Swiss-Prot record:
This is K(+)/H(+) antiporter NhaP2. SMART domains: CorC_HlyC (SM01091). SUPFAM superfamilies: FAD-binding/transporter-associated domain-like, TrkA C-terminal domain-like. It is a multi-pass membrane protein. It is found in: Cell inner membrane. Keywords: Antiport, Cell inner membrane, Cell membrane, Ion transport, Membrane, Potassium, Potassium transport, Transmembrane, Transmembrane helix, Transport. It comes from the Bacteria. It comes from Shewanella sediminis (strain HAW-EB3). Belongs to the monovalent cation:proton antiporter 1 (CPA1) transporter (TC 2.A.36) family. NhaP2 subfamily. K(+)/H(+) antiporter that extrudes potassium in exchange for external protons and maintains the internal concentration of potassium under toxic levels. One of its GO terms (molecular function) is potassium:proton antiporter activity.
C-alpha cells in the first residue's frame, strides 16, 4: 500500500465521519434515528451510491463491528445503575433468554416458509435476527425519560441477550455444517453454559481486578480512560477465546466499574462518551459500505414480510410470554417493550458467521439480516418517541445541567459541579437565594451574571440569564432538576402526575366523600399506599398508574425507593 493510498484512506474516512457528525444534527430535528443516518452515509459512499467505493471485506467489517460493539457496551454498562436491577433484572433476563428463543423459533418458521428453506436454515435466520441490539437501544433511548421499569428492562435486555443469539447461531451453524453427523446434547449444554457462565464470571472478575488496579495506582488523568478501555478489551478477547460471551463480559465489567467509586471516574465517562460516538459512526459506516443495495432487491418482498412478521407477531408474543410471571408490568408496558425490539449491528455481525463457515445460502442470510435491520430502524426507531407517549411510559422531562464535571477533591471523590442557566420561565427567577429549598449537602459555589462572578448572599435575588454553579452529587440531580424547572408552558406536562396529590398513608374512607368513591367492605379499610400495592404490586416506580373508580392513580413521588406521594388525575384530564 503506497503512501498516497494511505493518505486517501485517511481523507475519505475523515470526510465520511465528518459528514455523519454534521448530519446527526439534522436527524434529531426530523426524527430519523441517528444510527440510520450513519448507515445511510455508508451506503451512499458504497458501490451503488455516488461514492462508488467497492468494499466487500467481511473479515474487516467483522473486526470493526466487534471492536465498536465492545466499546459501546462498556460505556452502556458504566452508565447503567445497579439500583435499576431492583425492578428490571429478572424480567430482562427472561427476555434475554426465553424471549430470544421464542423470537428465533417464530421468526425461523416464517423465514423457512418465505424463502423456501428447510426448518434448520429458517431457524438460523431467526437466530441471526433474534436479539435486540445494544447500540441501537442505548442510542435511541438516550435523552428519553422513560418509566424506570421499562427503560431499565430494555437496556439490561439489550446488553445481555446477545449470548443467547450467539449460542443459537453457533449451534445451528454447527448442525448445518455437520452434514448428518449431528451435534450432541452435551455440546449444546456446554456451549450454553460457556456463553453465559464464563462470560459473566470473566466480566465480573475482570471488572473487580480492574477496579482494584485503578484505585491503587496513580496515573495522569488522561490515562485512566485508556486503562479502562484496554482492560475491557482484554477481558472481551479472553472471554471470546475461551468460548464465553465477550459481549456479556465487557457489559458486566462496565456495570461493575460504573457502580463503584474509583479514580478518574468523570474523565473516564467523558472520554468513553466520545469513543462510543466514534464507534457507532465507524461501525455503521463500515456496515453501510459493505451493503450493495441492488442485492437486496431479490429478497425485498419476502424480507419485508419477515421484518413485519417479527415486529408485529414474533416479538410481541415473545415479550408477553417472557413477562407472564412479572405482574408489575402493565399492558402498556408490555406493548411498548414489544415495539422496542430494535435490531442493529449484532444481527449483521451474526450474519457474517455463516459466510465465514462457508454455508450454502450464506449471502441470503446476510441480505435478509441487513433488510430486517433497515426496516427495524426505519419503522421502530422513527416511531419510538410517539410509541412511548401513546403507551404513557414517557415521563415529563426535568431540566438537566448545561454542564456537569467531576470535582477531584480526593481520589474517589463523587462530588460534581452542576451548571444551570436560568431562563425567564424558571420558577426560581425573582426569588432570593434563601428561599431556594436546596437539597441537603448541595451548595451554590458561584453565581454568574453577564460576565461578572457575584458573591451571593441569602438576600441575592436570582435574575433571568443568571448562571448558577452548584456543588452536589449525582443523587441530587432529580431534586435540583425540580428546583430549577420551568413554569409549565403546556398544561398536560405537570398533570401527567395528577391534578391533586396525596400522602400514601391517607385512608380511602376519608377520600370517598371528596372524590365520590364507592368503597366495598375491603376498600374502606385500605390506605392509598395499600391500594397501590393491590393494583400494581410492591415494586413501584415513578409514573406507575392504574384506573380505578373513574380516576387515574399515579405514583408521583418516591424517596429512597419508597412511594411518598400519589397523584389523582380527574377523568376530563385523562
Amino acid at each position: 500500500m503506497s503512501a498516497e493510498t494511505i493518505n486517501n484512506f485517511f481523507l475519505i474516512g475523515a470526510l465520511l465521519i465528518a459528514v455523519s457528525v454534521l448530519l446527526s444534527a439534522v436527524s434529531s430535528r426530523v426524527g430519523i434515528p441517528i444510527l440510520l443516518v450513519f448507515l445511510g452515509v455508508g451506503i451512499m459512499a458504497g458501490e451503488d451510491g455516488p461514492g462508488g467505493i467497492h468494499f466487500d471485506d467481511y473479515s474487516v467489517a467483522y473486526l470493526v463491528s466487534n471492536l465498536a460493539l465492545a466499546v459501546i457496551l462498556l460505556d452502556g454498562g458504566m452508565r447503567t445503575r445497579v439500583s435499576s436491577f431492583r425492578v428490571a433484572l429478572w424480567p430482562a433476563l427472561s427476555l434475554a433468554t426465553f424471549g430470544v428463543a421464542i423470537t428465533t423459533g417464530l421468526t425461523g418458521m416464517m423465514a423457512a416458509y418465505l424463502f423456501d428453506l428447510n426448518i434448520l436454515q429458517g431457524l438460523l435466520v431467526g437466530a441471526i435476527v433474534g436479539s435486540t441490539d445494544a447500540a441501537a437501544v442505548f442510542s435511541l433511548l438516550k435523552g428519553k425519560r422513560l418509566n424506570e421499569r421499562v427503560g431499565a428492562t430494555l437496556e439490561i435486555e439489550s446488553g445481555s441477550n446477545d449470548p443467547m443469539a450467539v449460542f443459537l447461531t453457533v449451534t445451528l451453524i454447527a448442525i448445518l455444517a455437520s452434514v448428518g453427523e449431528g451435534v450432541s446434547a452435551s455440546f449444546m449444554v456446554m456451549s450454553f453454559i460457556k456463553q453465559f457462565g464464563l462470560g459473566a464470571c470473566l466480566g465480573l472478575g475482570g471488572g473487580w481486578l480492574l477496579w482494584q488496579l485503578i484505585n491503587r495506582i496513580q496515573l495522569a488523568d488522561g490515562l485512566y480512560p485508556v486503562l479502562v478501555l484496554s482492560g475491557g478489551l482484554i477481558v472481551f478477547a479472553i472471554s471470546n477465546s475461551l468460548g464465553g460471551s465477550g459481549i456479556l463480559s465487557i457489559y458486566l465489567l462496565g456495570l461493575l466499574l460504573g457502580n463503584r467509586a474509583m479514580q478518574g471516574r468523570h474523565t473516564i465517562l467523558s472520554v468513553l462518551d466520545g469513543m462510543t460516538w466514534l464507534s457507532q459512526i465507524g461501525m455503521f459506516l463500515v456496515l453501510g459500505l459493505l451493503l450493495t443495495p441492488s442485492d437486496l432487491t431479490e429478497v425485498a418482498i419476502p424480507a419485508l414480510a419477515l421484518a413485519f412478521g417479527m415486529i408485529l407477531f414474533a416479538r410481541p408474543i415473545s415479550v408477553w410470554l417472557s413477562l407472564l410471571p412479572f405482574k408489575s408490568f402493565s399492558s402498556r408496558d408490555r406493548w411498548f417493550i414489544s415495539w422496542v425490539g430494535l435490531r442493529g449491528a449484532v444481527p449483521i455481525i451474526l450474519a457474517v458467521f455463516p459466510m465465514m463457515a462457508g454455508l450454502p445460502n450464506a449471502q441470503l442470510y446476510f441480505n435478509v439480516a441487513f433488510f430486517v435491520v433497515l426496516v427495524s430502524l426505519l419503522v421502530q426507531g422513527c416511531s419510538l418517541g410517539r410509541a412511548a407517549r401513546l403507551a404513557k411510559v414517557e415521563l415529563p422531562t426535568k431540566p438537566s445541567p448545561i454542564s456537569r464535571s467531576g470535582v477531584a477533591i480526593y481520589p474517589k471523590s463523587d462530588w460534581e459541579l452542576f451548571v444551570y442557566h436560568l431562563s425567564e420561565h424558571k420558577w426560581c427567577v425573582g426569588e432570593p437565594i434563601r428561599r431556594l429549598n436546596m437539597p441537603a449537602g448541595t451548595h451554590i459555589a458561584a453565581l454568574y451574571r453577564g460576565k461578572d462572578m457575584l458573591h451571593p448572599s441569602g438576600s441575592t435575588k436570582l435574575q433571568t440569564g443568571d448562571i448558577l454553579c452548584v456543588l452536589g452529587h449525582e443523587k441530587d440531580l432529580d431534586a435540583l432538576g425540580t428546583l430549577f424547572s420551568e413554569a409549565p408552558m403546556q398544561e398536560e406536562l405537570p398533570r401527567f402526575f395528577g391534578d391533586f396529590f396525596l400522602d400514601v398513608d391517607i385512608q380511602l374512607a376519608s377520600l370517598a366523600p371528596i372524590y365520590g368513591l364507592e368503597l366495598d367492605d375491603e376498600a374502606q379499610y385500605l390506605s392509598v399506599g395499600e391500594l397501590l400495592v393491590k393494583h400494581l404490586g410492591d415494586e413501584l416506580v415513578l409514573g406507575d398508574q392504574f384506573e380505578w373508580q373513574s380516576l387515574s392513580w399515579v405514583v408521583s413521588e418516591l424517596s429512597q425507593g419508597e412511594v411518598v406521594k400519589v397523584g389523582i388525575r380527574l377523568p376530563n384530564d385523562s
